[in-house]
Design a protein with these regions (language model features):
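Charge-rich amphipathic alpha-helical interaction elements
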Residues: 2-128
Length: 128
């Protein structure tokens, strides 16, 4: 089992990038939820409210995914910091195993989120 390795610094940069992106999605969910409330105020139709509930649930799920990702990334960051704390020159030359799982979860999350956003925008077009 050949595991890919990368420099500690590169992994750290990747983590920062993920956290920035997750921050962006967190803000975006807040905005989408506001739009959803507007729809609820304008429409009392049962069909619409069923869809509203669907999106509410989706936003909760995606928020949980974000929290889970952030948590995982922070654990990895702590592990990196421990390696560096033990040996401060490790940053320059030490390689660590590439964190494929987080990378995969991240792209899976982003794909899902973009699909959801598309679906939601179509819904808004119909009901706003």
């Amino acid at each position: 089992n050949m595991q890919t390795k990368e420099f500690i610094y590169d992994q750290h940069q990747k983590h920062l990038d993920y956290l920035n992106r997750l921050e962006f999605y967190t803000e975006e969910i807040a905005i989408l939820k506001e739009r959803l409330s507007e729809v609820t105020l304008k429409n009392t139709d049962k069909e619409v409210l069923k869809q509203v509930e669907h999106f509410q649930n989706q936003f909760i799920i995606q928020r949980n995914n974000i929290d889970e990702l952030k948590h995982t990334i922070k654990i990895h960051e702590n592990e990196l910091q421990m390696v560096v704390a033990k040996n401060s020159t490790a940053v320059e030359h030490r390689k660590v195993i590439v964190d494929d799982k987080t990378q995969a979860f991240m792209s899976y999350f982003e794909q899902n989120f973009n699909e959801l956003r598309k679906e939601f925008n179509l819904f808004l077009r119909d009901w706003m």
